[in-house]
Amino acid sequence: MKELKLAWRYVRRHWWQYILGILALFIVDEVNTYVPRFTGEITNGLDQHTLDMGGVMGLVWKIVLIGVIIAVGRFAWRFFLFGSARSIEKELRSDLFAHLSSLSPHYYNEHKTGDLMARFINDLQAVRTLVGMNVISTFDATVMLLLVLWQMMTYVSPKLTGVAVLPLILIIFGDYFYGKVMHKRFLAKQQAFSTLTDQVQETVSGIRVIKSFVQERKELYAFAKTTLFTKEKNLGVVRLQALVMPLLDLIVGIASLLTLAYGGYLAIYGEINIGQFISFNSYVTMLVWPMMAVGECITSVSQGLASLRRIQEIFDAKPEIVDGDMVNPSIQTLKGDISIEHLSFAYPDQPTVPVLEDVSVHVKAGETLAVLGRTGSGKSTLPSLLMRLYDVTDGMITIDGHNLREIPLAALRRNIACVPQDNFLFSDTLQNNIAFGSDNKSLEAVQEAAKNACIHDNIMEFPKQYQTLVGERGVTISGGQKQRSSIARALMKDAPILLLDDALSAVDTDTERQILDNLRRLRKGRTTIIVAHRISTIQDADHILVLDEGKVEEYGTHEELLNNGKLYASLYRKQQLEKELHEEGGAAHAE
C-alpha cells in the first residue's frame, strides 16, 4: 500500500528510537507478568506456613523492584516512541508544506483551502497517533498477550488457559470486519471535516460580502446543514465504536466467568493450588487490556491509514511547471529583452477555450510595453505566462534570446518584480510586507520604495507607522493603500523586469499621476509591462498592444493608435468623456 510506504519512509529515519522504545516496552511487560506469580507464591507460602517474615519481605522487595523497573521503563518508551511520533509529524508537515509550495496555481484552482487545511492539521494528527500511540498499543497488547498466556500455561495450567482463551478467539474474527468498516467510515468523517473547514474559511474570508448583502441567515442555515452532515459522519464512527466496545467487554467477561468456574473446579480437585488460582485470575485481568486494545488499535490504524491516503493524494500531485531537460543553470541574470512569437494559450481546466491566439510582440530591454483591452480580452494572462505560472500552449516566449524553458524557474522569477491584480498582503507589518522578496530590508530602503509608490505619507499617519500590522490579506487598510503597498514591494525588489497588472485601478487620478511620474524615472533601464484599463495609465509607453477576445487588434504608440481610429481610439474617447462628465459633476457639486 502506498500509504504504508509513505509512513515507513519516515519511521525508518527513527529506527533506533523505535528499537529502544520497544525494548523498554518489552521489559515493562515482561516484569509485569511476574507480579501475579509472586503474589501466588506469597499466598501459597502463607497458606501452607512455609514462609517466614523474611521470605515474605523478600518477595515484597522483588515486587517493589519490579515497580521501579516499570516506572523507568514507562518513561523510556514514552520518551522514545512519543518523541519519534512528534518528530515524524514535524518532518511530514514540513515536507507537505514544501510540496504544496511547489505545486502550480492550477492545483489550487481545483482544491479548496479548507480541505487542504484539514489534511494539513487533522489528518497529520491521525498519522501521528498511528506511528506513535498505535505502535505502542499494538506491540504492548501483542507482547502482553503472549507473555501472560505463557505464564498462565507454564505456571498454572494449559487446560485452564485454553478454556479462558477460547472466547477471546472470537475477537480475532470480528476485528477483520470491524477494521474494513471503520476505515470507510473514518474516511467519510475526514472528508466531511474538510468540507466543514472549507466552509468556515470561506465564510470568514467573505464576511464583508455576506454582511453587505445581508446573507448572515442564509450562511447560518448552510453552515447548520454542513454541521449536521459532519455530525452524522462522526456518529457513524462513534456508533461502531459504541457497538464494539461492549461486545469486547462481554467476551472478556465470559472468559473471566469460565476461568472462575473451571479454575475453581481444578482447585477443588487439587489440580492447581490456591496460589495458582489467585495468580490465574490476576492474569485473566491482565488479559483485559490486550483484548480491549485490539479494538482501539484497529480504530487507530483505520483512522491513520485513511489520513495517510488523504496526505498521499497531495504528494501524488506533481507540479506542472518545473525545470525540465532544456534548462540552462548558467542563466541567472536577465536584461529584459522580451520576444513573444505566435503565442496561443488556453487554461488547463478549459483547454478548448483559447485565451490568447497568435500573439506576437517584441520589447527591447529597457522599453515599456502597455497591454490594453476590454474585460476578458486575455491581457492579464500575459504576466502569468511571463513568470511561467503556466506554460504556453503554442508559440514561444523568449527573454534575452532564451526560451523561458531554458531559464531556471528561480532565476526567472528572481529577475521579475510583479504587482498582481489581487494585491495580496500578508498578516504582518507594513515594513515586512514591502520588504518581502528583497534582500535589503532596512527601514530606509522600505521608506524610499513607499515614497515612490506614494504610500509613505499614509503610513506615517498610522499610530505604529511602518510597524502597523495589516490584517489577513491586508483587510485593515484600504484598497488603494493595498495597491500602493504592492507597488512599493515590487519597487523594493529592483528587478530588471517590472510587471504591473492593473496596478493603479484603485488610486485616484492625482495619485496615479504622481506614481507614473516616479515610475518613469525608476523604470529607466528596466523592461516594464503595464496591463491596464485606463489609457491615462499607459499612453506614455513605448509600445501599446491592444487585445480583443485574445487576439491582437492593434499595435503602436499612443498617437499612432489614435490616428488609426479603431478600438483604442474608441476606448480613449469614451474615457475622456467619462473624465469630463466626472469633472463637470464635481464642479457642480462644489458650487
Language model features: what each stretch is:
Residues 26-37, 68-75, 127-130, 134-146, ...:
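Hydrophobic alpha-helical transmembrane bundles that constitute the permease/transmembrane domains
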Residues 13, 17-30, 66, 133-188, ...:
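Transmembrane helices of ABC transporter permease
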Residues 18-76, 80, 154-161, 270, ...:
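Transmembrane helix-loop-helix hairpins at lipid-water interfaces of multipass membrane proteins
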